[in-house]
Amino acid sequence: MSYRMSRAAYANMFGPTVGDKVRLADTELFIEVEKDFTTHGEEVKFGGGKVIRDGMGQSQVTREGGAVDTVITNALILDHWGIVKADIGLKDGRIAAIGKAGNPDMQPGVTIIVGPGTEVIAGEGKIVTAGGMDSHIHFICPQQIEEALMSGLTCMLGGGTGPAHGTLATTCTPGPWHIARMIEAADAFPMNLAFAGKGNASLPGALVEMVLGGATSLKLHEDWGTTPAAIDCCLSVADEYDVQVMIHTDTLNESGFVEDTIAAIKGRTIHAYHTEGAGGGHAPDIIRICGQPNVIPSSTNPTRPYTVNTLAEHLDMLMVCHHLSPTIPEDIAFAESRIRKETIAAEDILHDIGAFSIISSDSQAMGRVGEVAIRTWQTADKMKRQRGRLKEETGDNDNFRVKRYIAKYTINPAIAHGLSHEIGSLEVGKRADLVLWNPAFFGVKPDMVLLGGTIAAAPMGDPNASIPTPQPVHYRPMFGAYGRSRTNSSVTFVSQASLDAGLAGRLGVAKELVAVQNTRGGIGKASMIHNSLTPHIEVDPETYEVRADGELLTCEPATVLPMAQRYFLF
């Protein structure tokens, strides 16, 4: 006779199952388990008196015979494709299977074989997500990378050379010499990294040189002159060599207006950074381009979400980041032209309806590298409180909204930049770059971060203690962050053209160099999962009011946010 457990007892032992709901941190977002791949009564769990023991849940199968390297048991997977309960098998640094783990000699329906060579990570009661991707990085200081890793990011894409003034303001690694030095430096970090070259040129020669030097993308920035000629030249090179282009348009409208930029793009795929405009772009109506089918629009996190403090902090932030002086009236006017409460409020709603596709940081250059996930979920929470349930929801939960928002910093930036064949989602065959979360700390403080199947970071107590938990507990690099494990657990992304030109042999770096692919005509706004809406956007040039398909987009600023001070008392 089978043993019956209450739902509460079952969830406490094995984690939630179908129909159970989980609150995300202290938000008003609730997810519900849609499917359970495990078998009730045949669950595997590690520990004294538990299932994963020799001859029970652990088989005699060798690694060569099919046993996985690592199993994450009874995890609640949260990804763009679903919210499901499953065991996760990892092998050779990749996701080998999502299903039912155990001993096929003793248990039915086993799709993930646990053997003597299998390590166990207890996923009971934990949420597992794909590692986050930040697609707007100013590489101003290397310490950003550890900050990002400890927040749950496993891939960073952008440009820079350190605290040079070009890098402080723009997301570019200019020239093949600097790109080579950054690719060499990447060996030192437990993080997947990708570098963008400078895209501002009216002739292609120097841009081709950077792509052949390893640039995965080219960045057009107004501080270098984002003219129609530069836009056209940059996109022409990108189309020839299959790299993405990111654009920060002309705030001052010196070389043209938003219509001129759209005309210069000529329908070609482009990633529009901080499309709302506070981070830079045609004032006051750059936000209009989010309705273009070839434009992939993104946000940087200081405007996420719109709060009572957003406007005030942006003015000071902008003066520092763009080398402006508070004693020069023209500089003050430039700064004030970029900060508009009406477009920032509209940005909240455009994210909620899926018209803005990506959220990134703009690290140390009007953005916070460790708050990509936090700001994303704060925006989702604010929108639920102000706008209620989304019409796409099918149950008494927030599953669709949560899938929409997690896609903004996982799969969508990966698709936009040609990395989705390797990273961006928790799917079989992709790199095992995973983040485990205690639901109470979801999006704020990870429980564990894996890179290429190895544990790279985790909160850890006193190393001299008799157990791992005594205070002080803080985030520390783990074994995956050291030695050759570090260089074998993460990769550096480059262009295919650079690999064909022998870049790996010339630089002799330890990390694998992996080519980006399908960044041009094969993708566009329609490729952005759960975030592909293309409304017709209008901006009143005098009041800055924003309308989408004729509807006024406005909301109140938040006065209180979740995932904030109560999580950072210490």
Swiss-Prot record:
| Listed GO CC annotations | cytoplasm
- Where N6-carboxylysine occurs, the residues are 219
Kindly list the positions annotated as binding Ni(2+) 2: 219, 248, 274
- PANTHER family from the UniProt entry: UREASE
- E.C. no: 3.5.1.5
After translation, the protein is modified as follows:
Carboxylation allows a single lysine to coordinate two nickel ions.
PROSITE patterns, A to Z: UREASE_1, UREASE_2, UREASE_3
Instruction: Name the HAMAP family for this protein.
Output: Urease_alpha
Q: Where is this gene product found?
A: Cytoplasm
Keyword Hydrolase appears in the UniProt entry: yes
Q: Which species?
A: Rhizobium meliloti (strain 1021)
Q: Where is the Urease domain?
A: 131-570
Q: In which pathway does it act?
A: Nitrogen metabolism; urea degradation; CO(2) and NH(3) from urea (urease route): step 1/1
- Cofactor(s) for this UniProt protein: Ni cation
Q: Which reaction does it catalyse?
A: urea + 2 H2O + H(+) = hydrogencarbonate + 2 NH4(+)
Q: What is the lineage of its organism?
A: Bacteria, Pseudomonadati, Pseudomonadota, Alphaproteobacteria, Hyphomicrobiales
Could you say which residues bind Ni(2+) 1 here?
136, 138, 219, 362
- Which positions in this protein are listed as binding substrate? 221
Per its record, how is this protein called by name? Urease subunit alpha
Sorted alphabetically, which Pfam families does this protein's record hold?
A: Amidohydro_1 (PF01979), Urease_alpha (PF00449)
